Amino acid sequence: MLETFTNDTNEIQGRLSAWLIKHRLAHRPLGFDYQGVETLQVRSEDWLSIAVALYAYGFNYLRSQCVYDVAPGGLLASVYHLTKVQSNADQPEEVCIKIFVSRKNPKIPSVFWVWKGADFQERESYDMLGISYESHPRLKRILMPDSWIGWPLRKDYIVPNFYELQDAY
């Protein structure tokens, strides 16, 4: 199964991708962004083991985590930007990890226990697009009221006709 996900001859393989292949960690190289940051696709079921391996490799800083809706009725994508912070590093190594999940059952293992900075970022992603981060210690709405129905940043979200406004406190 590893070979079918990692060995695509049309993809450009970077240094981190080669390291993951060497350690038999399934992923798909997606190339490089405009700044030369390697982008990799990882399956949801492989994400936690790869996250731990990346932390052990030296990616000790979760710079950002975000989510986007790929297309109405299509997949949702969770994106992690990791940085290898070291002393005396002028240009720290970076990587971008993308995880695509079905909107019908969007579940991704939480990396809160690897990078504590994932706490509010995963909660915001849950609140806005409904991705459930499994084993997150406080996965609940952070921006919207608890009574809010639906996921407001999904492209197929239907805006309700009536909003009940509450006083700010």
UniProtKB/Swiss-Prot annotation:
Which terms does the UniProt entry file under GO BP? photosynthesis, light reaction
| Keyword annotations of the record | Chloroplast, Membrane, NAD, NADP, Plastid, Plastoquinone, Quinone, Thylakoid, Translocase, Transport
Q: Identify the Pfam families for this entry.
A: Complex1_30kDa
Q: What class of enzyme is it?
A: translocase
Which catalytic reaction applies to this protein? a plastoquinone + NADH + (n+1) H(+)(in) = a plastoquinol + NAD(+) + n H(+)(out); a plastoquinone + NADPH + (n+1) H(+)(in) = a plastoquinol + NADP(+) + n H(+)(out)
**Record keyword Translocase present:** yes
Task: List the SUPFAM superfamilies.
Answer: Nqo5-like
Q: Which GO terms describe its cellular component?
A: chloroplast thylakoid membrane
The EC number(s) attached to this protein equal: 7.1.1.-
Q: Would the keyword Amino-acid biosynthesis be found if you checked this record's keyword annotation?
A: no
Q: Name one GO molecular function term.
A: quinone binding
Task: State the compartments where it is located.
Answer: Plastid, Chloroplast thylakoid membrane
Q: What is the membrane topology listed in the Swiss-Prot or TrEMBL record?
A: Peripheral membrane protein
Report the PROSITE patterns cross-referenced here: COMPLEX1_30K
Q: How does it assemble?
A: NDH is composed of at least 16 different subunits, 5 of which are encoded in the nucleus.
Family named by the database record? Belongs to the complex I 30 kDa subunit family.
Alphabetical list of HAMAP family matching this protein: NDH1_NuoC
The protein's job, in short, is:
NDH shuttles electrons from NAD(P)H:plastoquinone, via FMN and iron-sulfur (Fe-S) centers, to quinones in the photosynthetic chain and possibly in a chloroplast respiratory chain. The immediate electron acceptor for the enzyme in this species is believed to be plastoquinone. Couples the redox reaction to proton translocation, and thus conserves the redox energy in a proton gradient.
This protein's name: NAD(P)H-quinone oxidoreductase subunit J, chloroplastic
- The organism named in the record is Anthoceros angustus (Hornwort)
What gene name does this entry carry? ndhJ
